[in-house]
Amino acid sequence: MTELPAPLSYFQNAQMSEDNHLSNTVRSQNDSRERHEHGNERRRRGNTESVSNGRAPSSSQQVVEQEEEEDEELTLKYGAKHVIMLFVPVTLCMVVVVATIKSVSFYTRKDGQLIYTPFTEDTETVAQRALHSILNAVIMISVIVIMTILLVVLYKYRCYKVIHAWLIVSSLLLLFFFSFIYLGEVFKTYNVAMDYISVALLIWNFGVVGMIAIHWKGPLRLQQAYLIMISALMALVFIKYLPEWTAWLILAVISVYDLVAVLCPKGPLRMLVETAQERNETLFPALIYSSTMVWLVNMAEGDPEAQRKVSKNSNYNAQRPANSPVTTTGTESESQDPVTESDDGGFSEEWEAQRDSRLGPHHSTAESRSAVQDLSSSILASEDPEERGVKLGLGDFIFYSVLVGKASATASGDWNTTIACFVAILIGLCLTLLLLAIFKKALPALPVSITFGLIFYFATDYLVQPFMDQLAFHQFYI
């Protein structure tokens, strides 16, 4: 309890002397009124002291506004950085696909269809072709939905070994079988003679290094390169074995499904991301392309005995957060030598006594502890910039490349439509990352980019290209 100010105590005594004849109820009312006035007086006194100390009441608002401005600057900084860090791999994946489509005729020949698209589009009427493409798209999307739900259920019930086995088998097929087919077709196209032993050694080294980099550990650039390569290989398979109308319809429907799966409260992809966040786990590297390292190596904790030696006879170490790492120098033999003196770093008891006599005893306060914790957290945040990564699903890479590859393979063979689709996808990706910086939650990456890509494709192929052909035919220059 704090003492009452002089005017208030005087008022209290006078009031009590005048009202001795009143009942206890009146006294209780006076007491409540006095407590109310006491609270008002304390608030007025607090405001007076804050103003006298030169601190305006709106200082806290200014601090909040300053923190918000710093957060916005940080968002813009990392947003622009990671936009470029995602533009490069997406561009590389699409360039690999387009270059393969333009040079290797194997991926433009219609040799068959996927088992998930059983209906052919070689029909007599447009209505039958449209119906078959719709049925193919429904079957394909159903398979994708079932596989996604199965993955979420396995992850929900911690069936990590099953998921790892599933992803490893998929990676093995892509890195060995599809890579062998791709390499063989490239050698045939450029008439490169190669024996089977050399091809086997090449594919073996390529596949084994890829499996290690993706599913275990490896340099970040190597992991990213393999993820881009397997995305391009999968996109080439879809481009070759998906009929034309079915491919466009699948791209349109998959963007809508991606929107529902990520944003709906019970969407499978949203449940997957939320479950990973609740468990504080990173998603599997074989599913996600990250602009930073996917696998994290935790720092080893310091030796408890060494920490006790370092923290002995030191009041400053009491202010250090318990989770901050302790860094010691010296060889192992020096730390184990029993003859050496205590490792006080020159800050002996005499030095501390002399310091206390000059400056007074050094005690930690709540403010100093909070300041040290904020400083240590800022240092740790600055030391781990790799965790500030933007992650993009490999499915997004695949369908971006399918759109550009189909445009390159089916659109009159001109570069205008291909480049238009390429620019549209990058614009959509930029807008998606902008929305990600604004809403700060997981967002679908397909809807905006695929919508722009489809609009640019059909507008360029059916409007811009005929217009340019007519201008060239009549020799008009704009």
From Swiss-Prot:
Membrane topology summary: Multi-pass membrane protein
Compositional bias (Polar residues): 10-29, 48-57, 312-339
Chain ranges for the short sequence motif PAL as given in the UniProt record: 444-446
GO cellular component entries: aggresome; early endosome membrane; endoplasmic reticulum; endoplasmic reticulum membrane; gamma-secretase complex; Golgi apparatus; Golgi membrane; growth cone
EC number(s) per entry: 3.4.23.-
Superkingdom of origin organism: Eukaryota
Cytoplasmic topology ranges: 1-83, 155-167, 218-221, 274-391, 440-443
Site-annotated residues for Cleavage: 292-294, 299-300, 356-357
Active site: 258, 396
UniProtKB keywords: Apoptosis, Cell adhesion, Cell membrane, Cell projection, Endoplasmic reticulum, Endosome, Golgi apparatus, Hydrolase, Membrane, Notch signaling pathway, Phosphoprotein, Protease, Synapse, Transmembrane, Transmembrane helix
GO MF, one example: aspartic endopeptidase activity, intramembrane cleaving
Region (Required for interaction with CTNND2): 383-410
Positions on the Lumenal side per record topology: 105-133, 191-195, 243-249, 413-418, 465-478
Record region (Disordered): 1-68, 307-347
Modification after translation (UniProt): Heterogeneous proteolytic processing generates N-terminal (NTF) and C-terminal (CTF) fragments of approximately 35 and 20 kDa, respectively. During apoptosis, the C-terminal fragment (CTF) is further cleaved by caspase-3 to produce the fragment, PS1-CTF12.
Residue positions, PTM Phosphothreonine: 340
Stated family: Belongs to the peptidase A22A family.
Domain description: The PAL motif is required for normal active site conformation.
Role description: Catalytic subunit of the gamma-secretase complex, an endoprotease complex that catalyzes the intramembrane cleavage of integral membrane proteins such as Notch receptors and APP (amyloid-beta precursor protein). Requires the presence of the other members of the gamma-secretase complex for protease activity. Plays a role in Notch and Wnt signaling cascades and regulation of downstream processes via its role in processing key regulatory proteins, and by regulating cytosolic CTNNB1 levels.
Identification of the protein by name: Presenilin-1
Gene name of the record: PSEN1
